[in-house]
Amino acid sequence: MSLNFLDFEQPIAELEAKIDSLTAVSRQDEKLDINIDEEVHRLREKSVELTRKIFADLGAWQVAQLARHPKRPYTLDYVRLAFDEFDELAGDRAYADDKAIVGGIARLEGRPVMIIGHQKGRETKEKIRRNFGMPAPEGYRKALRLMEMAERFNMPIITFIDTPGAYPGVGAEERGQSEAIARNLREMSRLNVPVICTVIGEGGSGGALAIGVGDKVNMLQYSTYSVISPEGCASILWKSADKAPLAAEAMGIIAPRLKELKLIDSIIPEPLGGAHRNPEAMAASLKAQLLEDLADLDVLSTDDLKNRRYQRLMSYGYA
């Protein structure tokens, strides 16, 4: 299966190609006198070591590329791998069902929870149907409807953030995109149930923040969170998207920097090579973090939850 290697992973890709070639030869002719298995084993060890070396020194732009990786697990992948009995709920009860936002009730180790997240889509048709993970106002209104339902039934809310940003089309603006985002920020700060938010890929601007006001905010190791994309920032400051790598470094979009600024609580480690290399292991780590966060929040009163959440929101922008 192709891993869709990125530019900075080309040395790894070359090694993996050699491994695949030798493995294919071994399968085609099992009567070969030479022992190919030993060479394959040696190359695999070399590939792992090379991957460790490359990933130990990634820059912000390389992390941004990983956050957008076409094979990276999306919300529904984590729902399938970490939760049980997911029942999707649709529509904002006002205009439409925005497929860029998915949500519904599931069980986390037997406990009912409300899941809400961005969904990008993989194949061309699905990407178009889900608008590449860029929600319109009806998507955020659907998310708010599900949050209010969770509050009525005293269910914790778990959100997964993975979007380039809110959809900037004329229709979305006409239907109140900024109002929908602002309303979500206000209402999420008032919810009487625990809210846990995790950035699993791209955390793009207000489109991410509209489901990102939580009691706990986590990021996967190779995810990003920013007010604008590196390309967008570069186009504004240097009039050229080619300066995106420079912008990415300057913007502080990666998890360690955001944790240093106290904008997030936890960084969830990814498998070697990124979440797409081992979605099952990534889902297990994510699930463990969610269970730990829920245990921490269960001991807090409703007033404490709301006060802490509100103060977090109000602290954004202060050094």
Swiss-Prot record:
Recorded family membership: Belongs to the AccA family.
Keyword NAD: no
Organism this protein belongs to: Salmonella paratyphi C (strain RKS4594)
Protein name: Acetyl-coenzyme A carboxylase carboxyl transferase subunit alpha
Subunit structure: Acetyl-CoA carboxylase is a heterohexamer composed of biotin carboxyl carrier protein (AccB), biotin carboxylase (AccC) and two subunits each of ACCase subunit alpha (AccA) and ACCase subunit beta (AccD).
Described function: Component of the acetyl coenzyme A carboxylase (ACC) complex. First, biotin carboxylase catalyzes the carboxylation of biotin on its carrier protein (BCCP) and then the CO(2) group is transferred by the carboxyltransferase to acetyl-CoA to form malonyl-CoA.
Keywords: ATP-binding, Cytoplasm, Fatty acid biosynthesis, Fatty acid metabolism, Lipid biosynthesis, Lipid metabolism, Nucleotide-binding, Transferase
EC number: 2.1.3.15
Subcellular location: Cytoplasm
GO terms of biological process kind: fatty acid biosynthetic process; malonyl-CoA biosynthetic process
Stored PANTHER family: ACETYL-COENZYME A CARBOXYLASE CARBOXYL TRANSFERASE SUBUNIT ALPHA (PTHR42853), ACETYL-COENZYME A CARBOXYLASE CARBOXYL TRANSFERASE SUBUNIT ALPHA, CHLOROPLASTIC (PTHR42853:SF3)
CoA carboxyltransferase C-terminal domain sequence ranges: 35-296
Name of the coding gene: accA
Pathway assigned to this chain's UniProt record: Lipid metabolism; malonyl-CoA biosynthesis; malonyl-CoA from acetyl-CoA: step 1/1
Major location (coarse): cytoplasm
Catalytic activity: N(6)-carboxybiotinyl-L-lysyl-[protein] + acetyl-CoA = N(6)-biotinyl-L-lysyl-[protein] + malonyl-CoA
KW DNA damage (keyword) present: no
